[in-house]
Amino acid sequence: MRDRREPEKLEQRIRIERDGTVTALSGKIDFGQGLRTAFAQIVADELDVPIERVHVVLGDTDQVPFDFGTFGSHSVAQEAPLLRKAAAFARRQLLDRASAKLGLTEDKLDTAAGAVVAGGKRVPYVELLDSEPLAGTVPDDVSLMPDQRRKYTGRSMPHLEARDIVTGRATFVADIRLPGMARGAMVRPPARGAKLRSLDDTAAKAMPGVIAVVRDGDVVGVVAEREDQARAAAAAVDADWHAIPVEGPTAEVPMRSDANVDEKLRAASVRLTQTYVLPPIASAPIGPSAAVADVRGYGATMYVGTHRPFGVRDQIAKTLGLPEKKVRVLPQITSGTYGRNSAADAAIEAAILSKGSGRPVLLQWTREEEFAWSPSRPEAVLEIAAGLNVDGGIVAWRYDEHTNVHTAAGLDPQVLGVTSGRNAIPPYAEFPARVTLHIEPTRLRTANFRSLAAAENVFAIESFMDELAGVSAQDPLAFRLRHITDKRFRRVVEHVAERSGWGERPGGRRGRGIACTVYHGTYVAQVAEVEVSLSGAVRLVKVWCVVDPGETVNPEGVRNQIEGGIQQSASWALKEELLHRDGRVMNTGWDTYPIATFRDAPESIEVFVEGDESAAPTGVGEPGAVPTAAAIANAVFAASGARLRSVPLTRERVRKAMPG
């Protein structure tokens, strides 16, 4: 375990192993974004070794440096410079050792394929380790490998673990098997926050295969030899609960407060006010939550799917009353969740069951449990007012975002602003604006979600930009461009228009819509083409996307992430809505919570990666999902005249909104 206050140490980042392979270490987690591959590309280039020799360890809390978690599309931006410098520093030390060993000045030395070379001599890195591993504080000014010598960075590569995943060799949490491992099942209360009044476990304890009925406060579960036995016994536990309504917190955060906004709105030549509504939606991972806990007297080992291995470690240590250093978290491959795995629900429950039974325990949630008990994306009501001058330019903007908390990190205004208020401030050229975030109470459990609040805010802002263009008789593209001064932002918007043939309107019942944004330094613009039937059914036909993530480590990896984000966001826009009553989720299965399937996929998604290579790399795990819903809604209006200010864009809603 590495202390979170330590400076960057080489031994925390890079190891040259005795077999000549290289181990690179990071606290980040790869749940489909391609981080493992990108990090391997960076390290292979800076150390001058074949990429197949680079092994990347992610999230093992006994090995990697402390990390707060993998979220917000920060990973490449944060880790790439650190790994690059560490690998370059390792190469520097190897050259120093070779110079002393060979008696040659360093200007006579070079590296190639995992060895120091000089004339006809070749010294493999492993022969330079002696008894001293590479170590030391990584300097900020270490010399990096020249761009022209990089073999991997900037080139498309398949994910290193892709073959294992598609052939079934990859290890997911449910694949873990430990000696003496039992299975667990939880006894669920009727509602979140309920308190346990009494418990009768007599019948459950007498059932076949039952090892223990475990209670820790208001947490109750059964441990048995087989999962079916554990579930049957859990159903036989007679628990009396006292339901206590739980509501989320409230807060108000001024995010931008320019002077005289209301006065300028009143004086505007054209004024427009609209409200946009987005429902809560489920994380709905293909693989429900699972964890294996092995709790012994001397400590605990956890096998989990998580975005926050150190956060899980800290929570497990607190739950079990152990020092942090006595808990090891070993992250496993997990289904893509983008936020859901920030919570350690299954891990905490498995740890309690393991401690209470004295056995390693595998706990797997059911699909119904996943829908009913996992956190969701909050609902949002977005109120926007803007004024235009006689030339059709924006002169004032007022934006009120009403939503719930998007994180469990507390109510610090700065935290709320970058989570629940993400992308609430429009990315266009500055005009007088007042932007206020209102955190409203809810009985629904809410937390991190892919793009946090950005997808909600951008849906409202980009739909409203189209409506402003409409009331001022301007083309939606031209209207946006007149309000963009950032050169990189302008370029992606212009290029997506060119790539999609924006000026060539599709015929029949088809229409195109545009939406764009800047997400944490990544510039993204999309055009969607849809077909709307007379009955209001929406079919997504094509999507064009131009993205600028700065320096691009793996272009194919970027395309994969953007395509996946578009597909998922299209599902949010067209299909998904979590129904709840007094905090209880009502639709807890695929039959009542539909998501987009293969038949709903568009004919094509064209992603053009046009990164500014002179700029630092930024994230791509979330930006692709941000503008899609607005692009689709704007396309639906272009195709049918139906302006939808809420999602999902169901057949019934679209038909009702169609003119005539």
Enumerate the language-model features and the residues they cover.
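Cofactor-binding beta-sheet edge motifs in enzyme active sites
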Residues: 1-660
